[in-house]
Amino acid sequence: VPIYSYVNEKIKKLKEIYKIKNLTISDKPVFINGETGTGKRVIAHLIKEISQSEKFIEVNCSQFTDELIASELFGHTKGSFTGAHNDKIGLLEEAHNGIVFLDEIHALSLKSQKTLLKAIEEKEFFPVGSNRLVKSNFRVVSATCENMEELIGAGKFREDLFARISTFQINLLSLKER
């Protein structure tokens, strides 16, 4: 019971600090920015818990190449590329009526950003190698430790995608500032 009280107290403080409760009323995208180790993942999970979303699909964008991220997000059909021995449901389809958490979103290439933008805007996409249109209603929560304005200015991140994923923004304090 003492650990439960401790966790509840921490959650109350986080809600208060970041006004997270207001974010859970809506299904609009949330963008979390903060240095490594500041709790971006914790905030994303907290949004999921407070919004009582049943599904929470987590994707670390920095661990995939362009080809693999497309397959992971959108799925693929058997034979669509070497090694595609079976059909695979994409994580965006799996996140239907739930939340997809795109961690380290800054790591996506411009090509992947373009495809993701279309899927976010239209809530539909084609799996790799398929002509079957998949519709999926998902909420995007994304995070990065990078300065997005600098990346946009340098042409490394699409301004239109950033506008779509950052309806609500949470800027976490650095560890020094805390």
Model regions: which residues?
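Interdomain coupling/hinge region of P-loop NTPase helicase/AAA+ cores
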Residues: 166-178
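Charged helix-capping and loop-helix junction motifs
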Residues: 153-157
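Short amphipathic alpha-helical segments, especially helix-boundary/capping motifs
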Residues: 65, 164-166
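AAA+ ATPase active-site-proximal loops
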Residues: 2-135, 140-147, 151, 174-177
